[in-house]
Amino acid sequence: MFFVHFWVLSKPPFYSPNPEYPLHNYDTYLIYIKTALFYPLHKFSCFLCVLGSEVIRDQQTVLLFGILIFSIFVALIAINRKNLELDRFAKWYGLLAFGVLTSLELVVTRSGDIANYFGPPEKIFFLPSYRHYPVVFLPLICVYSLSILYSTLSEENKGMIKTSANAFLKTMLFTLLICSFILNFFPGIKTGEHNFVSMSERSAILKTYDVQPDENLKKLHLNPEIVKKRAKKLEELRLSVFAENNILLYKPDEVKLLPKQSQLQGVLRIYNDVKFVLFQHPISNENRSIIVFNEIYIPQNAKLRFSIALHPDVWDPEKGDGVTFEVYIRDEGFEELVFSKYIDPKHNPEERKWNDFEVDLSRYAGRNVTIIFSTLPGPNNDSRWDWAWWGEPRIEW
């Protein structure tokens, strides 16, 4: 895989000398190879760390576990050297080879180099990130599977010494697998939650790519122009996040906001729930803020779905008196209030979340209407700390 990357990345349009993102091009891959040739022992040590990271993620002990796994494999081969049954166990050796090669690729490209992209080349301790685990988890499992096969084979051949030795190695590997499960269970859950939040955030950014600042687009790719180009194609083909039957309301035709408010669109996380948002700070009860979407076609059986919340930073009781969220529909010259909800998470803990709502739009089916979002301060007309957010307002059918 490394050499496929190396060959492909040396050809247009992948090859790029862009100094802002030099990690994947021909010249950089040459640096990775040179580092491996000049520092082979350091790279081997990092490879053992990758093996050990299948059991534990501790900088101080990961190398010891890597040495242990490698030593067990060498002992397994030595004990069964006269009866390896390579043809019979080929699939496990193939998987083992794949796991070892992908681990080596990771070590070569991410464990330090002479250009210092990923730290100094003299590294002897290396922990791969969790996102790389799908490509490095195989060696320990394959070695354990081989130990079971050789243990069974030695029992069939009635070799007492081999049987005892293979059983001992099998027990050691099984113990390592149990330790791996125990040590990585809760960190794995935490990492899964982090990845879920990260993917939700990126999904929200992708859905609204054409209004997102370059800083957010760089979370998808370091070149924002590439994001815009590819996202537009996905949108045209209705693929990925654009495949859903909905109209996301995120590009208003008219706004009247608090003069000091500089941000309209954004991405907000409340607990582990991330949404694209419209920020609408109330002005006053006499001068409502508005966000207007004109000429929105309403399909059959359509519903307006959205979430409302105040930013978690203003949930303290002394910060304001809540916000009223309202939605109006303007149709054929008539304006109708179809939704109104007052929330005050500062004093009502049950509202410290995304509060989900929907409005039935079936009576407007087949027509173009104007949808107006509005916010008002609380009953005391106190607009301080009223950081009001509409979460992913959309029409679904």
From Swiss-Prot:
Q: Where in the cell is it found?
A: Cell membrane
UniProt GO cellular component terms: plasma membrane
Cystine residue pairs: none
Its domain of life? Archaea
| TM annotation in the entry | 62-79, 92-109, 135-154, 167-189
Record keyword GTP-binding present: no
Q: What are the record keywords, sorted?
A: Cell membrane, Membrane, Transmembrane, Transmembrane helix
Topological relation to the membrane, as annotated: Multi-pass membrane protein
Major localization listed first in the record, in broad terms: membrane
Q: Does the keyword Cytoplasm apply?
A: no
Q: What is this protein called?
A: Uncharacterized protein AF_0303
Write down the species. Answer: Archaeoglobus fulgidus (strain ATCC 49558 / DSM 4304 / JCM 9628 / NBRC 100126 / VC-16)
Species lineage: Archaea, Methanobacteriati, Methanobacteriota, Archaeoglobi, Archaeoglobales
